[in-house]
């Protein structure tokens, strides 16, 4: 089913993005991952596969549209096509709104929302050719607001709205668009250090398997918005 398919995962050097890339690669999908640091990109790519014909590491920042255009061009030159895009890159700062700086606000909006647009804008023509799939990784914070989350909530509410509107726009090209909204995930996000204490949380590979299941669905069906949370709360 996945023979010769190619996926691009932004923020793919660790956490959710790496978990998704590893699962897709294990299923025979050729993967390109991006990150902001060369050493992180190289290390993650080597962990995904030692075969350069199956994995491509790219240094890119989703806040830079030209960098995302270049990333897609590299993918096409290396693999010849692009079938799946998983827009995963994201960040968060959690402070009361009166303490949140302008720079912190802009960092979140430019990464979590504008970066999402840049990634889709840079890849959409290739997805038209392949009649491919675009998935954004948003958050339950895109529908549930909370204390100290004003900037993060705004960016993730926006990400959900953007992705759902894009889904309607792109259906006529046979491009499928979904957004995944995870709850607590065991990653390094917000200074967390994954350990045994995180065993109750969603694991990155769980999201990789979810993405894989979405790609396996009959093409007549489109799971446009998916909430996923730990099955049991942390006690």
Q: What spans do the regions from the language model cover?
A:
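C-terminal helical subdomain
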Residues: 179-180, 196-235
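Substrate-binding pocket helix/loop in short-chain dehydrogenase/reductase
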Residues: 96-97, 104-106
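Residue(s) in the substrate-gating loop at a strand-loop-helix junction
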Residues: 139
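The beta1-alpha1 cofactor-binding region of Rossmann-like NAD(H)/NADP(H)-dependent oxidoreductases
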Residues: 59-71, 102
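Active-site helix of classical SDR
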Residues: 120, 155
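Conserved glycine-rich Rossmann-like NAD(P)H-binding loop of the short-chain dehydrogenase/reductase
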Residues: 27-44
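Conserved glycine-rich cofactor-binding loop
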Residues: 13-15
């Amino acid at each position: 089913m996945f023979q010769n398919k190619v996926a691009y995962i932004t923020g793919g050097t660790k956490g959710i993005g790496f978990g998704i890339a590893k699962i897709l690669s294990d299923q025979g999908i050729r993967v390109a991952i991006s990150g902001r640091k060369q050493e992180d990109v190289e290390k993650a790519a080597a962990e995904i596969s030692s075969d350069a014909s199956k994995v491509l590491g790219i240094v890119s920042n989703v806040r830079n549209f030209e960098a995302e255009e270049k990333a897609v061009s590299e993918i096409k030159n290396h693999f010849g096509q692009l079938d799946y895009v998983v827009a995963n890159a994201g960040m968060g700062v959690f402070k009361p709104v009166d303490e949140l700086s302008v720079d912190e606000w802009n960092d979140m909006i430019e990464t979590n929302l504008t970066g999402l647009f840049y990634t889709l804008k840079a890849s959409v023509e290739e997805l038209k050719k392949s009649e491919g799939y675009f998935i954004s990784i948003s958050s339950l914070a895109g529908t549930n607001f909370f204390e100290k989350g004003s900037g993060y909530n705004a960016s993730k509410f926006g990400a959900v709205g953007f992705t759902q509107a894009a889904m309607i726009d792109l259906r006529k090209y046979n491009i499928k668009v979904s957004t995944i909204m995870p709850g607590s995930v065991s990653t390094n996000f917000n200074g967390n250090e994954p350990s045994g204490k995180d065993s109750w949380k969603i694991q990155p590979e769980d999201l990789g398997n979810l993405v894989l299941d979405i790609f396996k669905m009959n093409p007549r069906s489109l799971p446009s918005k998916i909430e996923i949370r730990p099955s049991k709360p942390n006690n």
